[in-house]
Amino acid sequence: MDVNPTLLFLKVPAQNAISTTFPYTGDPPYSHGTGTGYTMDTVNRTHQYSEKGKWTTNTETGAPQLNPIDGPLPEDNEPSGYAQTDCVLEAMAFLEESHPGIFENSCLETMEVVQQTRVDRLTQGRQTYDWTLNRNQPAATALANTIEVFRSNGLTANESGRLIDFLKDVMESMDKEEMEITTHFQRKRRVRDNMTKKMVTQRTIGKKKQRVNKRSYLIRALTLNTMTKDAERGKLKRRAIATPGMQIRGFVYFVETLARSICEKLEQSGLPVGGNEKKAKLANVVRKMMTNSQDTELSFTITGDNTKWNENQNPRMFLAMITYITKNQPEWFRNILSIAPIMFSNKMARLGKGYMFESKRMKLRTQIPAEMLASIDLKYFNESTRKKIEKIRPLLIDGTASLSPGMMMGMFNMLSTVLGVSILNLGQKKYTKTTYWWDGLQSSDDFALIVNAPNHEGIQAGVDRFYRTCKLVGINMSKKKSYINRTGTFEFTSFFYRYGFVANFSMELPSFGVSGINESADMSIGVTVIKNNMINNDLGPATAQMALQLFIKDYRYTYRCHRGDTQIQTRRSFELKKLWEQTRSKAGLLVSDGGPNLYNIRNLHIPEVCLKWELMDEDYQGRLCNPLNPFVSHKEIESVNNAVVMPAHGPAKSMEYDAVATTHSWIPKRNRSILNTSQRGILEDEQMYQKCCNLFEKFFPSSSYRRPVGISSMVEAMVSRARIDARIDFESGRIKKEEFAEIMKICSTIEELRRQK
């Protein structure tokens, strides 16, 4: 049957159909190959926008640096990074005037956080540039490596476990004449295989010590590694994102804590809240503007877009903001917050892996590492790449490019939001001193501007004034990509507002479907996604029911677990049929064991095992929930797990789902091919780290685990905990005298070994 697609929309208001135009079905585009070209683009673009600034040379690293601050006044229509310090400071002063005590209070809150934060805060986050190995690593490993190197170089303040003490070590490390680091390397040798008598290559992994002089160390400490941003929809070109090393991370964290605390107190800030809370906040601002634009006033809204937000932000500007925000605060606090922007003013961008070359004629492939780009003959490159390399050459040092202006993606989201809001704040009538006034919303680089005025000329004048004010602080509103509408219809951070927020359901499409973790988690995540969308995204009952049926179908095809009485033949059907036939209560079988689906839209909140428990045969219950089942490597499962779901916009977000441990909650084993590479030593470190953490958690169940205060080590803490627990168990008669004595003996032995070490 042919359906005329326009018929589908006859009854649908236009604003609800907007979501069908989004590029969210199907797989998002991923990048392949190296990000070197994209990174060079970013570096060159950033310098181009600030080209009229002053050039200086960093005395420590010899890196050329461009400073556009207080440069020429910006020109119309051309994006530029020439922020004027006095304008930024004045915007901050007015923001404080409108919100008395906001900076003071946020500083006090942040000071408390600074004194309490532990080093392990830095283990959160995924890939981090590891300066000791000069490549990316999981955050926990990169931190462990950094601390290990610090300690072997006599920097031990970090042993207190407080982040601020670790940062003291970072500061001291920058004054050292040289640092000794441990790097991994691999040796290859050809040996004859005894069995096959063929020659094979044998690899051994070694660790070697290496000395790094002050200049090289500073370059590494200030380096941001770059990667290509993956899975970005609706774009033709990829772009580069940065991951900073451990030296920068802690300082950035404190700055962002302060900025977050300020954003929470600003009604125009779209951060740090999200979801429904964000919608409510936005709706308030709109309501305020619409109520105030009485019959005499016009109200228009700009759905705003800024040109190259990151490339035109400037760390020196952020330093000025922090200096203002923390005035009258203790010296140590001001110092610790000013370090992040100073490090960013001296940052280096690592160019990634370099370029791949292949010759079709000679069937050769070779990689030109980034370090060689400074000296290689350019005749091998095509025109556009040649131009890029020529431009970037003066900035290159050891395969990294000096990048003083600009911010790189996602580093100071909160602080840049404060800057944006400070301009929105200037729209009050008492500041514009005329008939027009404005307000709006800001969330990192995204903004919506609402302008009220008695007539169209006033609206135009208001928009112009806003545009020019932004220019003075390095924000470039794009005239091409922003559009204006009567207030009541606009888009902000992919929320569509039309007299209230319209559910943009297509954004959630990528998170429907089977996640591929394991049978148990996938079922749970699948129904939770449907449930959440019924709550938050106008997913109606009929559509939800259909989504559920499609999900179950998808699930059965993924895990080849069609119902036991089906005709479909798969690899598993023989076993599942046998199970079906010998089960008395067939309704009790899980879907993944060929059972029927008992979910409907009323019971999505109940885990499948609980839903069917009463219906299960007793022996099936025994097999399903048996921790001694030899086929399952069990992790202890909390009642709630976190899944990573991919919404169409923004980062992957974490979603809670109920987890019931069954024989279906298996964990896939690690791919073995890593064991033959130079990463192997790293993997072993990581596993060691994991084992220690798991052991520690066994001693301190989460309910009783208070963060350790004072300088007790993990081992001491576990030993003392074991003694206390043993005494309680002995006195209450849970363990015998002999067992108690044995535990005490083991504890003493451990302490003795530590003393000998």
Curated annotation (Swiss-Prot):
Compositional bias, Polar residues, is annotated for 55-64
What the protein does comes down to: RNA-dependent RNA polymerase which is responsible for replication and transcription of virus RNA segments. The transcription of viral mRNAs occurs by a unique mechanism called cap-snatching. 5' methylated caps of cellular mRNAs are cleaved after 10-13 nucleotides by PA. In turn, these short capped RNAs are used as primers by PB1 for transcription of viral mRNAs. During virus replication, PB1 initiates RNA synthesis and copy vRNA into complementary RNA (cRNA) which in turn serves as a template for the production of more vRNAs.
Name the InterPro entries for this protein.
RNA-dir_pol_NSvirus, RNA_pol_PB1_influenza
Summarize what the UniProt record says about post-translational modification. Phosphorylated by host PRKCA.
Q: Which GO terms describe its biological process?
A: DNA-templated transcription; symbiont-mediated suppression of host gene expression; symbiont-mediated suppression of host mRNA transcription via inhibition of RNA polymerase II activity; viral RNA genome replication; viral transcription
Annotated source species: Influenza A virus (strain A/Udorn/307/1972 H3N2)
Lineage, please?
Viruses, Riboviria, Orthornavirae, Negarnaviricota, Polyploviricotina
**Residue ranges of region Disordered?**
50-82
Domain annotation RdRp catalytic: ranges: 286-483
Top-rank lineage group of the source organism: Viruses
Q: What is this protein called?
A: RNA-directed RNA polymerase catalytic subunit
Family per record: Belongs to the influenza viruses polymerase PB1 family.
Q: Name one Pfam family in it.
A: Flu_PB1
- Which reaction is the catalytic activity of this chain? RNA(n) + a ribonucleoside 5'-triphosphate = RNA(n+1) + diphosphate
Q: Where is this motif: Nuclear localization signal?
A: 187-195, 203-216
MF terms per GO, please? nucleotide binding; RNA binding; RNA-directed RNA polymerase activity
Q: How does it assemble?
A: Influenza RNA polymerase is composed of three subunits: PB1, PB2 and PA. Interacts (via N-terminus) with PA (via C-terminus). Interacts (via C-terminus) with PB2 (via N-terminus); this interaction is essential for transcription initiation.
